[in-house]
Regions:
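Long, well-ordered, tryptophan-enriched scaffold segments
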Residues: 197-214, 223, 228-299
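Structural recognition of the beta-strand scaffold that forms the well-ordered cores
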Residues: 41-44, 133-136, 159-163, 202-206, ...
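N-terminal hydrophobic or amphipathic helices/low-complexity stretches enriched
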Residues: 24-76, 87, 97, 216, ...
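A conserved hydrophobic secondary-structure block that centers on an alpha-helix together
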Residues: 138-217
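Bacterial N-terminal signal peptides that target proteins for export
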Residues: 2-11
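Bacterial N-terminal signal peptides
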Residues: 12-22
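Noncatalytic luminal/extracellular "stalk/propeptide" segments of secretory-pathway proteins
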Residues: 49-174, 278, 287, 297-299
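Acidic/His- and Gly-rich active-site-bordering loop/insert found
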Residues: 43, 69, 103, 247, ...
Length: 308
């Protein structure tokens, strides 16, 4: 997560600068290629330590970009190149755990190997006890596609388990969502948001490499360690308590004890008559221990005055 945020800022800087130079004077335009190569080489070097906000590398990055703006005779916004962005950093402690239980048989998820989990709620301690696990298919409510995986079920306080992507990808049918092209309904961000709107206590997306578009290692590396987010007035209480991913192979192993079959669940989720249902006897227990830190990050912005 940290790297995702810093890469976004890094790429936005390069894109903005390249557009700006192209539209400015001939002297700048003539050196666009060389300058971009220099900036990319510099910012991607080990000296900048990953460029993460709230770190020494982040500070070096901000100073480098602001100096570059100044060297290009760009104007600061309201007297400063730095625009304040109140940020929270939540780090999951090792004492946290996630357990799936079936009729007294507990399976503790090994962080990184079996599953990853976190909370967007900026609190030092959260817990979930004996939360009923519900399979909600793709976890989508899309009136324009006449699709509602949550219709007829109350998941308040429960744990929803969700397939990644959307039904169009699984079937390849162009008239079903957008075929193989993922819609926003297929993204994990939407699935967590919808689960929160439905009042779920926890939401876990099932990772399949083909459907997700990336291997498990991406999930493992992105969601462990400090997680950055915007500071929120409600401390993130509008989110579910626990968000996470589980490997498809891990879930399949768990389901083998319950009498359910993972491949069968995927097929059922594509039926027009699909209704979400409880995975009877399967419950989730979790304790989340966080280190919460608040910091002042920055966006860096500048402009060049036009001639008219």
């Amino acid at each position: 997560m940290t790297m995702k945020i810093s890469k976004t800022h890094f790429l936005a800087f390069l894109l903005g600068i390249s557009i700006l130079i192209t539209s400015c004077s001939d002297s700048l335009s003539d050196t666009t290629d060389g300058r971009l190569r220099h900036w990319i080489s510099t910012l991607s070097s080990d000296e900048f330590q990953g460029r993460a906000p709230g770190t020494e590398g982040g500070k070096l990055t901000k100073n480098f970009i602001s100096k570059t703006f100044k060297d290009l005779d760009l104007e600061p916004v309201k007297g400063s190149y730095f625009l304040e962005v109140p940020t929270s950093e939540i780090t999951l402690k090792d004492s946290s755990y996630l357990t799936l239980s079936f009729r007294g048989d507990d399976r503790k998820m090994i962080a990184g190997k079996d599953a990853v989990f976190w909370t967007k709620q900026a609190r030092e301690y959260r817990k979930i006890r004996d939360s009923e696990v519900v399979f909600v298919g793709y976890g989508i409510v899309a009136p324009e596609y006449n699709w509602n995986d949550y219709e007829g079920i109350d998941v308040r306080g429960k744990t929803v388990v969700i397939l990644v992507n959307d039904p169009g990808f699984a079937t390849g049918k162009l008239r079903l969502f957008n075929g193989k092209s993922m819609t926003y309904y297929g993204r994990w961000t939407y699935k967590f948001e919808e689960a929160a709107r439905q009042g779920a206590a926890a939401a876990i997306v099932i990772h399949e490499e083909e459907s997700a578009g990336y291997p498990w290692s991406v999930v493992e590396n992105s969601w462990q360690g400090p997680q950055l987010d915007l500071q929120r007035d409600d401390l993130g209480n509008d989110r579910v308590i626990l968000e996470g991913w589980i490997r498809d192979s891990t879930l399949n192993d768990v389901l083998n004890f319950t009498g359910f079959n993972y491949d069968a669940l995927k097929e059922i989720a594509l039926e027009k008559t699909f209704s979400a249902f409880s995975l009877r006897g399967l419950t989730l227990n979790s304790e989340i221990h966080n280190k919460v830190r608040y910091l002042q990050s920055h966006n860096i912005a500048a402009f060049k005055k036009g001639n008219s």
